Amino acid sequence: VTEAGYVPEAGDLIWTDFDPTRGREQSGRRPALVVSARTFTAHTGLAVVCPITSRVRPFPTSVVLPPGLPVAGEILVSHVRSIDTLARPVRYAGACVPSPLAQVVRAKLYSFITI
């Protein structure tokens, strides 16, 4: 259940629970980067997010978070998924990611989402 009144927006760092999952999907309670617009989430109750792992192993479709943010680790851009913000626990983790980092994440998303 989302904190009262909070609607995730692009660039927010949040905590959520990704369970249940299947196969190699990221699971469990973990931070994530919101990549969908606030208006989308407000109208649909869904947020598109990229999970974050604390195990940093640079991979072409991942982005390491810079120091100084409230969450440390690596954004798993290739694990992008939508979550139901009304059915899953969603907690704001802190400040929005810097614009240059958001641009890198966007470019990596575009590199493999080609429709």
Predicted features, each with a name:
Residues 1-115:
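Conserved functional hotspots at enzyme active or ligand-binding sites that engage polyanionic ligands
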